């Protein structure tokens, strides 16, 4: 009876206590996945961030590429600048490297300069090279130039590298000094270092990079007073010439590019590059019978050396190796019968 009364009392108390209403299914219950319509704003924000990162990456890449192009152009233009070095005062063999840093406002100019001079003691031929690498940057390492190539400037303008910066300059007039054809706009070309009208590429005095750039009867060679090679007439009798038998300078300079510019041109047809008297200078001399040199000696006919032909030296070396291999094979063939006979005689004695 007491247990039944206690149970009824508990039921009455439970009924009397106010109960909170059941929560709405969308208020405090477990979170429900939003539908597709609710997810669009979040996905759109994520895509925008991704596109923004891609744009920043592309801008950074373009800036790095632009800086690299500007630096390469600066190095090439600085290498063509006048060095004002007196070659006569340098020793026959000379090597020097210098590094300088100059502060100009917020910019720092770094210049790396290398000078090399090599002289062949036998022929007297000389090779002089100068490399100037220039880097210009502000405190943040950025470079600012008005132009990079000639096409960046307007008509009748060209891109010039001066004072460690690129600027657009008006084209130079006729007979003015020049170092490349783009400085002489219009129908002008840079001929023997001066802007000239009515000139054709590959003619006498025009700028060249290799032998294929010059017309027949001319060769691409460096000239005193010019910092670039030009198409030069082949030397005639008594003029200085390029001796192909001197391989030292060829291996140092032009072996990797057989058609590149030379220090001197080979002789014209019918002439041969020979030592002048007893000196180390080579000049063009006739190759036919009856001609005499300055000492009164008769010049016998000689064929033009094969060194003028590209790859002839390697062909000679290959031929010598083949002859040596053939002689070794024949010697081994002669020794084999003798060795067999000796083996038979040795077996009978045993």
From Swiss-Prot:
Cysteines engaged in disulfide bonds, as pairs: 208-220, 214-231, 219-265, 241-273
Region annotated DKK-type Cys-2, chain positions: 208-284
An annotated GO cellular component: extracellular space
Predominant place of localization: secreted
Domain observations: The C-terminal cysteine-rich domain mediates interaction with LRP5 and LRP6.
Family assignment from sequence similarity: Belongs to the dickkopf family.
Primary role: Antagonizes canonical Wnt signaling by inhibiting LRP5/6 interaction with Wnt and by forming a ternary complex with the transmembrane protein KREMEN that promotes internalization of LRP5/6. DKKs play an important role in vertebrate development, where they locally inhibit Wnt regulated processes such as antero-posterior axial patterning, limb development, somitogenesis and eye formation. In the adult, Dkks are implicated in bone formation and bone disease, cancer and Alzheimer disease.
The name this protein goes by in its record: Dickkopf-related protein 3
Organism: Homo sapiens (Human)
Gene field: DKK3
